[in-house]
Swiss-Prot record:
Subcellular location, record wording: Mitochondrion inner membrane
Amino acids binding Fe(II)-heme a: 64, 380
Membrane topology: Multi-pass membrane protein
Protein name, UniProt field: Cytochrome c oxidase subunit 1
Gene, per the UniProt record: COX1
CDD domains: Cyt_c_Oxidase_I
Family the entry assigns: Belongs to the heme-copper respiratory oxidase family.
Binding site for Ca(2+): 41, 46, 443
Amino acid sequence: MTNLVRWLFSTNHKDIGTLYFIFGAIAGVMGTCFSVLIRMELARPGDQILGGNHQLYNVLITAHAFLMIFFMVMPAMIGGFGNWFVPILIGAPDMAFPRLNNISFWLLPPSLLLLLSSALVEVGSGTGWTVYPPLSGITSHSGGAVDLAIFSLHLSGVSSILGSINFITTIFNMRGPGMTMHRLPLFVWSVLVTAFLLLLSLPVLAGAITMLLTDRNFNTTFFDPAGGGDPILYQHLFWFFGHPEVYILILPGFGIISHIVSTFSRKPVFGYLGMVYAMISIGVLGFLVWAHHMFTVGLDVDTRAYFTAATMIIAVPTGIKIFSWIATMWGGSIQYKTPMLFAVGFIFLFTIGGLTGIVLANSGLDIALHDTYYVVAHFHYVLSMGAVFALFAGFYYWVGKIFGRTYPETLGQIHFWITFFGVNLTFFPMHFLGLSGMPRRIPDYPDAYAGWNALSSFGSYISVVGIRRFFVVVAITSSSGKNKRCAESPWAVEQNPTTLEWLVQSPPAFHTFGELPTIKETRNQSSC
């Protein structure tokens, strides 16, 4: 009973971080199952496993997207790593609002329940994660499925807003003595920028889906031309949230990768301040490019020219980060342990995803490529290999600190190589399919596309084998069997530890710091 009370009512940032990780893992497995069903359907031309039910196919697409974005990447990145390590990294005893932290987590399971029930009610919600009207309107989706999905989004949105308020307050007000803003570890900076993005973008989404809800149920016509509304207004509102959202998913990953590259190159991060201002620039510019998702809806030519240029400008701070990671590794004494493998894999694959993004930024090219598999390949290279590789990298980097036990290195490396091979085999052929004109969200296709689709589906099965390997690693590491106890600082940085988590025991005590640490200087800015 006391154990149950501890986990239900916990206000400890480490306990809540662990809950987020468990929740993210469960949602991630479910989302992966949906993605495998999608790839099984697309393995060959014609109807395969769904019996020609095209609505069901789109329900799978929608559920896969929502699960992966709102219930896997965000809870694990921001809720898991953020809760676990932000207070430790800044020398704080806990988060600023511990009970708010608790409710932020416990809003997510009901939200997940609502999402899953939306897939089971009537014919499900087959709108895609964008939930565009008129497809999501009451005439096209007459049951309660879309309403349930909207309520699910509302709940997870409230959870994220409360969490971001908590992170902003914690980072601004609870830094230990001597921890100035310019001494903050890059992961903390990444969470801070992410929290601001959430705080500014989610209310816009909430407004859009609330208007959609009233259009569906109370006869308003916000998005219905018959009553003077405009479905394009919904697209503007959604993407004003949706584009910052993709940076919300990747920015904490940037912070994690910076720590790992620095640790395993035995060097401080190249251009610390440049890295910080690059993240802030990405955050600001992320709000100024939303209509590049809408080049095909009839925007004015000048508008398209602006959004093309603004989208390309985002590549500049992103490039600064990529080249700073490479410069950090340059001349370093690099150790290719599992976290570093995932970090290098991240840099390579994220760069490919970024380059295809530059292609899609051109409004003329995007008109040809919009809603084809080229776009699917692009954002999966950025997310399925960017955000997810950063998650795995962070797990292997900090797992000793979390569990207090070392992970099996060989199994970790096997996990990396299987996953690396699997995801590339899944998503690289999609570029060719997109360039050949294969449209997204359609469960059948002409025979001409059969070869690349078969290869892509085979790659997804390999990825599943890699994910199974990962859970084997988790099981071995968390059990008190053969693997040895983890040192305070497992990566041999004890001579010159750069961040505070390597100065506390593994796992940290329930109350991390007996007394608050005082920061005299950091490697980032040793002249302070």
